[in-house]
Amino acid sequence: AEVLMDFPQLTMTLPDGREESVMKRTTLVA
């Protein structure tokens, strides 16, 4: 939540309607 608040521009909307931080996605992929 902190990341989304600090970097709203890094938030992406997924096809299922959820919003996830690009940073979080990168961490999950890595």
From Swiss-Prot:
Any one biological process term the GO annotation gives: proton transmembrane transport
Recorded superkingdom: Eukaryota
Keyword tRNA processing attributed: no
Reaction it catalyzes: ATP + H2O + 4 H(+)(in) = ADP + phosphate + 5 H(+)(out)
Primary enzyme class: translocase
Keyword Cell wall biogenesis/degradation: no
The protein's assembly and partners: V-ATPase is a heteromultimeric enzyme composed of a peripheral catalytic V1 complex (main components: subunits A, B, C, D, E, and F) attached to an integral membrane V0 proton pore complex (main component: the proteolipid protein).
Sequence similarity: Belongs to the ATPase alpha/beta chains family.
Note: Two separate genes encode the catalytic 70 kDa V-ATPase subunit in psilotum and equisetum.
Protein name, as recorded: V-type proton ATPase catalytic subunit A isoform 1
